[in-house]
Curated annotation (Swiss-Prot):
It comes from the Eukaryota. InterPro entries: PSII_CF48-like_dom, TAT_signal, WD40/YVTN_repeat-like_dom_sf. It comes from Oryza sativa subsp. japonica (Rice). Residues 1-36, 37-67 form a transit peptide. This is Photosystem II stability/assembly factor HCF136, chloroplastic. A 7-bladed beta-propeller torus, about 54 by 55 Angstroms, with a depth of about 25 Angstroms and a central pore. Gene3D superfamilies: YVTN repeat-like/Quinoprotein amine dehydrogenase. The keyword Ribosomal protein does not apply. It is found in: Plastid, Chloroplast thylakoid lumen. Essential for photosystem II (PSII) biogenesis; required for assembly of an early intermediate in PSII assembly that includes D2 (psbD) and cytochrome b559.
Length: 416
């Protein structure tokens, strides 16, 4: 097939280097003045009402913010950013060797940098990303040690080996199938890159050469196996709507129309398609802290896979410590159960786990939900209801370092 041949043709992509506070005062009665007259009571009440009219009543945990100060939330605070209101924030990462140093990406050629743990951010100019008349959408950033990677659309790949002090641009082949949507630093001079057509590439020499980890794009796989039994998969020509990677290198992706999903794990030659377990179309999917899957549907529903989501098949070997997999390597359970959520009818767009039990979900019109039982039940953080933005992404980079990314330049930081 032409698509397969094209992917093999680029198995190795040869790349060259480059407040005022006011309390409601109610007079306290003295023991010797219990017989205070009706006239005195009316006067005291009027005084209290006038005092209340002078300034607003301040509620605990939600102080009124000045015009130049962002509002406080129960467990999150908003961080003001020096960017245009229309920017959508897309990814964030910190340098492992310097946790106070991080980068924030977005649309409209947005790259922001912090050197104080995310308290303040400033624009970062990268000359090699400004040579052309493109308005880049920077999709993904990842660090390991001092080595980092940034990818964007139109196709652009940036690499640093000094914790982001300097960046070099690495040219890419014009024949790369699809748009780059995700990159993960995996080791010294090594990274893994994914496109929205399902191509996965790995490099071990700073991006100068890339090797295909799958034999063909998703559309080629699905159109070759038209009898797969996956609803909406036959004659598939779309791309991924979302793709998420587990800590151990497994991927789950949602088709562009949300009518099915796909999984892949290291060693598989192809992506594996799966029927969606619910009637409504899928919005997003990702990995729980226990290894299972969470699934969001359009309209605000949230589902959790039963068990860990994976059922492994082992082949008996002479060496009892060796494990291999039958084909297909894994069977993903398609058995999901719905969780109890209060999203006010707004769609939930992403979920991020802080621990095995605690997670946060975010969505349209400032919806922010919390679970403390692994996702079975969720409670809305009402303090976030006044945020006039869609919250697209929840990212926990450690137990106490978490961020919510939204449109209109909205960034929330976890303060616990």
């Amino acid at each position: 097939m032409a698509t397969t041949a094209s992917l093999h043709l680029h198995l190795h992509l040869l790349l060259s280097s480059s407040r005022r506070r006011c309390r409601l005062l109610v007079p306290r009665a003295h023991t010797d003045s219990i017989s205070t007259g009706r006239r005195r009571f009316i006067a005291d009440t009027a005084t209290a009402s006038a005092a209340a009219a002078v300034g607003p009543l301040v509620l605990p945990r939600t102080p009124l913010a000045r015009a130049d100060q962002p509002p406080s939330l129960s467990e999150w605070e908003r961080v003001l950013l020096p960017i245009d209101p229309g920017v959508v924030l897309l990814d964030i990462a910190f340098v492992p060797d310097d946790p106070s140093h991080g980068f924030l990406l977005g649309t409209r050629q947005t790259i922001l940098e912090t050197k104080n743990g995310g308290n303040t951010w400033f624009p970062r100019s990268i000359p090699s990303a400004e040579d052309e008349d493109f308005n880049y959408r920077f999709n993904s950033v990842s660090f390991m040690g001092k080595e980092g990677w940034i990818i964007g659309k139109p196709a652009i790949l940036l690499h640093t080996s000094d914790a982001g002090d300097s960046w070099e641009r690495i040219p890419l082949s014009a024949q790369l199938p699809g748009n780059m949507v995700y990159i993960k630093a995996t080791g010294e001079q090594s990274a893994e890159m994914v496109t929205d057509e399902g191509a996965i590439y790995v490099t071990s020499n700073r991006g100068y050469n890339w090797k295909a980890a799958v034999q063909e794009t998703v559309s080629a796989t699905l159109n070759r196996t038209v009898s797969s039994g996956i609803s909406g998969a036959s004659y598939y020509t779309g791309t991924f709507n979302t793709v998420n990677r587990s800590p151990d290198g497994r991927y789950v992706a949602v088709s562009s129309r949300g009518n099915f999903y796909l999984t892949w794990e290291p060693g598989q030659p192809f992506w594996q398609p799966h029927n969606r377990a619910v009637a409504r179309r899928i919005q997003n999917m990702g990995w729980r802290a226990d290894g299972g899957l969470w699934l969001l549907v359009r309209g605000g529903g949230l589902f959790l896979s039963k068990g860990s989501g994976f059922q492994f098949f082992y082949r008996g070997l002479n060496d009892a410590h060796a494990i291999s997999y039958l084909h297909p390597p894994n069977q993903i359970t398609e058995d999901f159960e719905e969780a109890s959520v209060q999203s006010r009818g707004f769609g939930i767009l992403d979920v991020g786990y802080r621990s095995k039990d605690e997670a946060w979900a975010a969505g349209g019109s400032g919806v922010l939900l919390k679970t403390t039982n692994g996702g079975k039940t969720w409670v809305r953080d009402k303090a976030a209801d006044n945020i006039a933005a869609n919250l697209y992404s929840v990212k926990f980079l450690g137990d106490n370092k978490g961020y919510v990314l939204g449109n209109d330049g909205v960034l929330l930081r976890y303060v616990g």
